[in-house]
């Protein structure tokens, strides 16, 4: 029957302990709020009466359960928690003492060796201890604890004091080590984020040895990491001295990665206002920062400190309840769903099933999101400047009277209906670089960090282009119809039509990933414009007296001059943009063809911009790993972008 038992626990650690106990013939049979039944191989099933439970909290870093032993009828307190906390709560034992004290000292020393060995293996460690109480002692404690629970003022402090009175003078029972395996793809994701220029801090509640082992396992720290260690008693003056002595620990251009490892006690002083600046100066010289034995409050304080003082965008990712405060404080919070529960997911902005998906979320979707927003904002500026300036140029010919050469309903629907959907589709579906390329070249993510898609000169060039197109869109029809007897709306109709074609075709030129959805929306916008103009022109007899747009579109669709004006205006307005984009693509194709030809002939070609970028990636990767010969090989054989990138890939191994 025991083999068919299935346990549900609050955390994987709890379940692992129960399953391990069952493997040693100590099987949990049932659990109710009042009692626990355990089946022992030697004595059979025993029922323990549950008297009280002190749940885990991040301040105490432990939990306790009070039971009545079924054989001795004694009140026993069992406590498990972090080894650094439990060891301080043990009863004082002297190596020169009597039998029990000496035995306890031997157990403590042996357990400490086991803990150190577990930590070096990357296991999550816990210590387990117990305390036997008399009924009188327990009744006295329970009465005071009840007063603390019912207190209105300082309730949290009173409960903490009550727990401290119970959890002291403990007898050590032993320690446990639970394997916490890295998920698939974690080292590769960490390495990709490093290449993308993202600085990673590891905030964990594990002990230092475990945290360092995990940091090495997930490539957060490389094998060439230069370790700078200094012992300290965690006093503020000594922390300040340590910061001054180690700044800068490693020159940033030395090719080595400097890492900072700091424990929770030292971090408590480093987060003090007088030391915050020095602490951040020290971390600025380190590519990796590992904060171990950190409480949930300290995690959130570190995120607040980095976010407020360094003025950077922060992202926090976690999978447990201890990470909730950190996730909520960061600019972007990501929760990893899994066995740790759903608290982190519920508190996050985004949720992923595994850590490895973070690299695609940032490098691919983050890059796309940035370029889409940047390009869409630029396009909205361009669209409005290009169209509104038509009214501006017209004011020079109407005495700045404020009149318009088109009906106000057309002006309203031009932005509201005819040209609103294409920019949205552009901002949702645009992909300037394929997902495969972004994953293979994490360095491309740096373009978003440097705001290369929305630089000041890009903005002003876009506005100048919009001014030029508005000039062409206005004056080509103006000089075409100059001297004719057309009215104001007959003159404005070619302007609106040409402006629509120019704005939509400009979007096609700028888009790098046209789909059938783009073409469907653009075609629908054009058809809706002509349909509205025809219906509105047929119905609007007295819309805007004394002149009215009555039957204007119907007459123009039969006039060859109208088509000639629209086509000529569109071509002249978009010619500079088309030539600029075409020249850029032609230059890229020519560079690729030259590289391929030189690659076949065995000559080293003159690298283009893309090739230089790929070479720099290979060079920086080679230097980062300390392999200068590989760096030289990447430079000597960098015939093309693909070749240079392939030379860089071995750096990853």
UniProtKB/Swiss-Prot annotation:
InterPro entries: ATPase_P-typ_cyto_dom_N, ATPase_P-typ_TM_dom_sf, HAD-like_sf, HAD_sf, P-type_ATPase_IV, P_typ_ATPase, P_typ_ATPase_c
A single MF term (Gene Ontology): ATP binding
GO cellular component: endoplasmic reticulum membrane; plasma membrane
Changes after translation: Autophosphorylated at the conserved aspartate of the P-type ATPase signature sequence.
Keywords, comma-separated and alphabetical: ATP-binding, Cell membrane, Endoplasmic reticulum, Lipid transport, Magnesium, Membrane, Metal-binding, Nucleotide-binding, Translocase, Transmembrane, Transmembrane helix, Transport
Record topology, Cytoplasmic segments: 1-375, 429-458, 511-516, 581-653
One of the Pfam families matching this protein, by short name: PhoLip_ATPase_C
Protein name: Phospholipid-transporting ATPase VD
């Amino acid at each position: 029957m025991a083999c068919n038992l299935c346990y549900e626990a609050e955390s994987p650690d709890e379940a692992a302990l129960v399953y391990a106990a069952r493997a040693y013939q100590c099987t949990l049979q049932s659990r109710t709020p009042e009692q626990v039944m355990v089946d022992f191989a030697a004595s059979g099933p025993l029922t323990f009466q549950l008297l009280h439970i002190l749940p885990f909290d991040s301040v105490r870093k432990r939990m306790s359960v009070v039971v009545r032993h079924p054989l001795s009828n004694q009140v026993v307190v069992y406590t498990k928690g972090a080894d650094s906390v439990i060891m301080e709560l043990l009863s004082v034992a002297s190596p020169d003492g009597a039998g029990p004290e000496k035995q306890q000292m031997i157990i403590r020393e042996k357990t400490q060796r086991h803990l150190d060995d577990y930590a070096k293996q990357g296991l999550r460690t816990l210590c387990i201890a117990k305390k036997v109480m008399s009924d009188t002692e327990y009744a006295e404690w329970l009465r005071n604890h009840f007063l603390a629970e019912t207190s209105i003022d300082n309730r949290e402090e009173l409960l903490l004091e009550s727990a401290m009175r119970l959890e002291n003078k403990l007898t050590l029972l032993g320690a446990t080590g639970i394997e916490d395996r890295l998920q698939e793809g974690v080292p590769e994701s960490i390495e990709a984020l490093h290449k993308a220029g993202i600085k990673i801090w590891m905030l964990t509640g594990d002990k230092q040895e475990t945290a360092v082992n995990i940091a090495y396992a997930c490539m957060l720290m490389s094998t060439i990491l230069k370790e700078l260690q200094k012992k300290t008693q965690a006093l503020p003056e000594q922390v300040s001295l340590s910061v001054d002595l180690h700044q800068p620990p490693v020159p940033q251009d030395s090719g080595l990665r400097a890492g900072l490892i700091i424990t929770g006690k030292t971090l408590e002083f480093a987060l003090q206002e007088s030391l915050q600046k020095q602490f951040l100066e020290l971390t600025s010289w380190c590519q990796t920062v590992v904060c171990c034995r950190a409480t949930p409050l300290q995690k959130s304080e570190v995120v607040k400190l980095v976010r407020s003082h360094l003025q950077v965008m922060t992202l926090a990712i976690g999978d447990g309840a201890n990470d909730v405060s950190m996730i909520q404080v960061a600019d972007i919070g990501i929760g990893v769903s899994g066995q740790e529960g759903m608290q982190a997911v519920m508190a996050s902005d985004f949720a992923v099933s595994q850590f490895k998906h973070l690299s695609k979320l940032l490098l691919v979707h983050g890059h796309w999101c940035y370029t889409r927003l940047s390009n869409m904002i630029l396009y909205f500026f361009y669209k409005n400047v290009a169209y509104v300036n038509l009214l501006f140029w017209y004011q020079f010919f109407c005495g700045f009277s404020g009149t318009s050469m088109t009906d106000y309903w057309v002006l309203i629907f031009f932005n509201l209906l005819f040209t609103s959907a294409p920019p949205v589709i552009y901002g949702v579906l645009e992909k300037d670089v394929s997902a495969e390329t972004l994953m293979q070249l994490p360095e491309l993510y740096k373009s978003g960090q440097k705001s290369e898609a929305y630089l000041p000169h890009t903005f002003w060039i876009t506005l100048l282009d919009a001014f030029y197109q508005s000039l062409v869109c206005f004056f080509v029809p103006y000089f075409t119809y100059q001297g004719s007897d057309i009215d104001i709306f007959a003159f404005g109709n070619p302007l609106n039509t040409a402006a629509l074609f120019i704005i939509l075709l400009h979007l096609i030129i700028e888009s790098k990933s046209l789909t059938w959805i783009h073409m469907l929306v653009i075609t629908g916008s054009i058809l809706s414009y002509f349909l509205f103009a025809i219906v509105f022109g047929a119905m609007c007899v007295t819309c805007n007296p004394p002149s009215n747009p009555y039957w204007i579109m119907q007459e123009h669709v039969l006039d060859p001059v109208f088509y000639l004006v629209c086509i000529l205006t569109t071509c002249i307005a978009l010619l500079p943009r088309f030539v600029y984009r075409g020249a850029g693509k032609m230059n890229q194709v020519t560079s690729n063809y030259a590289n391929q030809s030189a690659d076949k002939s065995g000559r080293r070609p003159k690298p283009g911009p893309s090739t230089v970028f790929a070479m720099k990636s290979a060079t920086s990767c080679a230097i980062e790993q300390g392999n200068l010969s590989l760096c030289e090989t990447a430079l000597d054989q960098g015939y093309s972008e693909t070749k240079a990138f392939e030379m860089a890939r071995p750096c990853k191994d």
